[in-house]
Amino acid sequence: MAAPASRQVRRRARAAPRPRSAEDWWWDRLAPRGSGYHLLQSDSMLLVLSEPGPARPRAQRRASRRTPRQPPRGPSAAAKPKAGLRSEAAAAPAPAPAPTPTPEEGPDAGWGDRIPLEILVQIFGLLVAADGPMPFLGRAARVCRRWQEAASQPALWHTVTLSSPLVGRPAKGGVKAEKKLLASLEWLMPNRFSQLQRLTLIHWKSQVHPVLKLVGECCPRLTFLKLSGCHGVTADALVMLAKACCQLHSLDLQHSMVESTAVVSFLEEAGSRMRKLWLTYSSQTTAILGALLGSCCPQLQVLEVSTGINRNSIPLQLPVEALQKGCPQLQVLRLLNLMWLPKPPGRGVAPGPGFPSLEELCLASSTCNFVSNEVLGRLLHGSPNLRLLDLRGCARITPAGLQDLPCRELEQLHLGLYGTSDRLTLAKEGSPFLTQKWCHTLRELDLSGQGFSEKDLEQALAAFLSTPGGSHPALCSLNLRGTRVTPSTVSSVISGCPGLLYLNLESCRCLPRGLKRAYRGLEEVQWCLEQLLTSPSPS
């Protein structure tokens, strides 16, 4: 029986304290005990916080988990062991007990509970700003009580998108799902959305009015409302919202079925503070534009009218001069994929005041439009601060008409034609007028589909090689798809524009095979330059 006893003694002797690991040494080196600092470690960061009551070192926390439970004291604990084992144990010397670190009093709540609430809210705010409040805040609220308290702060719920669950479901099931979601919103609105600023409703069909009523009661700070694919929006709901939310200044009604009377009533109530308005063109758009022409929204800065899925064959008649008088503060005007006609000014009528604050004009269209040099002059004759001009699909615009514009600091010019016109009627020369005027400020230039000759394009793009002051040109995006640009011209542009990050050479008949594609990024653009310098010229 001596062998088991000696084996037991050896086992106990091996229970000596382990040497400290390198991780524990660094842990104590970064935040020594008594220094007033403690470390908080997560999966991807290490925080050093100054706070009274430093955290326990890792070794002590691990030891507290490994400490065995003490046997209960009582009569049963004092029972005598077996006689054989007792005599053998008495013969062998008793080993010294292994020193175990004594853990500090109080449970280890974890690093997440030790972060101050205001810091945790700021961390959550960075994630919300990047990805939105959902689903992150909902998941974070389940981690612990401190995280739930931080995720419940109304300041984090400033931007919310509510999508109806009826997509892909039958109509009856969709109504039930909307009612169920509405019941949840009755609690969320007063408890989470009291500081809501931006709200988006997507594909709501039957419960739009109750939701807007809740918003008016619980969200006084609302500034932006978007209704996308929604039905049943009434005038009472919009007017009530305009009265309850005194800071509401932006309304997006694109792709929603809203009566023109409802929109006009809303603009009459909140028009004095309206800044941005998005609409989808329909037969009722004329009535809404009539309210804008009557100076209903004198502070309007952004106006966008686009075409819905079901294209309207009736062109929109837009009185340009009346719009300039009704919206003198307009900064962005977008008529996207819209067939519209400028209303004739009439004989003897003085030109309008223009848009002195206009910075962006977008008239892009994939269909036939009636935008000419004369119409463009009526729109932009008083806009010296224009930065973006998008005329894609406007085949009637010529370089001569663009040369007369008063803007001198244009940064983006899009003149691409995508198979919407006859190449025989396109201008063959005049592109140097554009680049010579704006070569010092242009960052994006789109000439795709234009019919300029090889020599004309060479002269136009050569303007970027001799910018005033000897500085590098600002050009970073160049679209030459379907043009007659030559390899030597492309090589010169790449060499003279070191900041070029996008170059589209698709369907360029004068370039060698294998190079007719789009290049994205500095490496691909430089690779294109190397290939052009080493490839033989096409026959």
Curated annotation (Swiss-Prot):
Occurrences of domain F-box (ranges): 10-162
Keyword GTP-binding: no
Gene Ontology terms for molecular function: ubiquitin-protein transferase activity
Regions of compositional bias (Pro residues) in chain numbering: 94-104
Chain positions of LRR repeats: 177-203, 204-229, 230-255, 281-307, 312-337, 341-365, 368-393, 394-419, 423-449, 453-481, 482-507
Comp. bias intervals (Basic residues): 8-17, 58-68
GO cellular component terms listed in the entry, alphabetical order: SCF ubiquitin ligase complex
SUPFAM superfamilies: F-box domain (SSF81383), RNI-like (SSF52047)
Subunit structure, interactors included: Directly interacts with SKP1 and CUL1.
Protein role: Substrate-recognition component of the SCF (SKP1-CUL1-F-box protein)-type E3 ubiquitin ligase complex.
Protein name per its UniProtKB record: F-box/LRR-repeat protein 6
Record gene name: FBXL6
